[in-house]
Amino acid sequence: MLPVQTSQLAAAFTDAVRALAPADANLPAVTFERPKAAAHGDLACNIAMQVAKSLKTNPRELAQKVVDAVKADSRATALVAALEIAGPGFINLRLSPEARAEVLRAVLADGDRYGARPVGEHGQVLVEFVSANPTGPLHVGHGRQAALGDALANLLAWQGWSVHREFYYNDAGVQIHTLAISVQARARGLKPGDAGWPESAYNGDYIADIAADFLAGKTVSASDGEPVTASGNIEDLESIRKFAVTYLRNEQDIDLQAFGVKFDRYYLESSLYSDGRVEAAVQSLIAKGKTYESEGALWLRTTDDGDDKDRVMKKGDGTYTYFVPDVAYHTTKWERGFSKVINVQGSDHHGTIARVRAGLQGLDIGIPQGYPDYVLHKMVTVMKNGEEVKISKRAGSYVTVRDLIEWSNGGEETIRGCLEAGVADWPAHFTRGRDAVRFFLLSRKADTEFVFDVDLALKQNDENPVYYVQYAHARICSIFEAWGGADWEARLGELASVDLAAVTAADVSPQAIALGRRLAEFPDMLAAASSELAPHAVAFYLRDLAGDFHAFYNADRVLVDDETVKRARLALLAATRQVLKNGLAVIGVSAPQRMDREAAPA
């Protein structure tokens, strides 16, 4: 149902139960869910079973009284055609044809905003994701973060939040020094395995590319920074460091552009030190008695806030442990007015959650417990040609986001080749690969491991889940083209006020009813996915919606001779196309109007 319909029906049920309960009774909220079997109706409610014990009555008897009261309520009679009691006290509901028609009209009227809440309904939210070290190409784990984080940010925006996307660069750790000496070694003509090659050095081919550009005195720039020109002096480690970091930030920017992800801000860890924020946070914790010294180190009393043991903040050599700048960084989020913050990170960061939260609580500046929220994801395994791919030649030790996009795109075209050729709209050349990677990485819950099958991503048939969904959209477009010609989109307005009885009446095909029911669930699905920080739910929904469409398409011919029936079915397809388009937009995947199709395997 539409949210307004749900509220109206819930109010009728609530009033019915309240009239049967003592005035001071604490009643649960009335909720509805889809029955497991379509034969049981459109919705089910278990309120009678929830409150029967407290009211000292039989659940079925209570359910009957609720049903009698709801049937007499005009708010419900406009929406419900039938109410039935099942099992120990479930109340099954069948919606009226008018209620079904109201859903289709709402989709057609709201268009690209169907399922969205009013802009500004909520406050500000900051979503931090990817946040890779600028020491190498983005790997598939970063790709999963990018897909999750961007889809989650879109979801929150659809729910009326003002969303700020942020990328935190860890550009102040020991890994940056390792990057610099790796490039320096390459610039000196060394390669992995040679005598004198640093043991901790990065081995990917990208290090040789950086070294070559550094020796050539080239200039590079990241999206938010000043250009950096290489000095070419292989003894100047600081110059190498600056050039290498900027070079890799630019490479990561290219990968994110190919992936269709944009950030509002890139926040540098190094700025927390140069601005004195790290030291200020530490001194504040000391002043508030949240630290102590032991074994030559400074410790934070994280056990005061639920951690299993206290943690070292400052080591004996005077350097800070890695969670300390994180505390300072999250303080800036709070000070910038973000009362809601969500971090999307790999599950290997689980151990830092309690430490960061304990540090924030220790500062005693009003930050609520449980701040920030976290979405943790597990690893991704890549399969290609039936075998696991563990190493990328470019990265040296892992598969990159760029690898996945190019492999899943089909053909021989590469991102580097497009850039070197000066192709202006090069990201559009990789739409197929981007769509596949984004959809695949959202097709499982974040907290489950995922196997990315490149061979499956390349298939152009129903075995490929992203193709299956996109083809539903393209097939609908082809039906409209057959109906309205090349300018069919301009004619969709004709369907806004058609008689919808042929797709909403009680005696129409179950496939038509199921498809309309799925369209009605879209707003509530988005709200739940946003609340639960679960963007995978959108991908799940889209696969179900595509399945319902294909079932309807196979059951009911659309372009029939009967004009009334034809227009009603076209209106149902127009609404389906709109919801497919909206859902794909939420997860950052395109909705093509034409698609090639290969034969399914025998």
Swiss-Prot record:
Its EC number is 6.1.1.19. It is found in: Cytoplasm. It catalyses: tRNA(Arg) + L-arginine + ATP = L-arginyl-tRNA(Arg) + AMP + diphosphate. Its main location: cytoplasm. GO terms for biological process: arginyl-tRNA aminoacylation. A motif ('HIGH' region) lies at residues 132-142. It comes from the Bacteria. Monomer. HAMAP family: Arg_tRNA_synth (MF_00123). This is Arginine--tRNA ligase. It comes from Cupriavidus metallidurans (strain ATCC 43123 / DSM 2839 / NBRC 102507 / CH34). The gene is argS.
